[in-house]
Structures are given as C-alpha cells and as structure tokens.
Amino acid sequence: EKYMSKWENMKAAAQSDLEALKKAETSYGDSWKRRGGVGAFMMLARKFDRVEHQAQKHGWDIFEAGEVYVGDAGLLDDIRDLRRYLLLTEEHITSSALGNDEILKYEGEEEGI
C-alpha cells in the first residue's frame, strides 16, 4: 500500500504541474521561451541555482533543506518551478522534433511506465 501511495503522490504532483502550467500560460503566454533556447536554459539554471543554494547551506542534504525552507519561497516551491520549466522544455523539444521517433519515444514506454 505504501508503494502505491508513492505513485499516487507523484501522479497528483504531475497533475498539479499541468494545472499550474495551464494557468500560467493564460497569464504569461510563452514568455518562458521568448529569448530562445539560451534564455530557456538560463531560466532552468537559475531555478537549479536556488535549489543548490538551499541544499549547500545544509551540507548538501536536500531532505534537511526541504524541512527548513518551507512556504512560498521554500525549497519545494523551487523544485516545483524547476520541474515545470523542464516539462515545458521537454514539450517544446518533442513538438519541434515531430517525425524523429528517437526523440519522441519515452523511456520505459513499452513497460507502461
């Protein structure tokens, strides 16, 4: 049962990401990629820098940092932002690569993951 709850929690996180991305697109459009691929990369790097900074303050123990940095500007908020920008980046790359089956195929697709 604990095993299933982990997957259900991740499914809920993914669904929450999709809903947040839809809402953000209504307000901001595609502003995340307005400055091209380099700008999109820098946005990802900036989000990771925030995660890295908080973990570094706790001897690189990201779990401990997650317990300390909570709330709207907390570690989980930065992790969620990074994950959402990564989803946007993946979607952009895959939609730009239509016809390239190697790029479009998801890892573990055959197993139903």
Task: Please report, for each region that a protein language model flagged, where it lies by residue.
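Intrinsically disordered, low-complexity regulatory regions
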Residues: 1-113
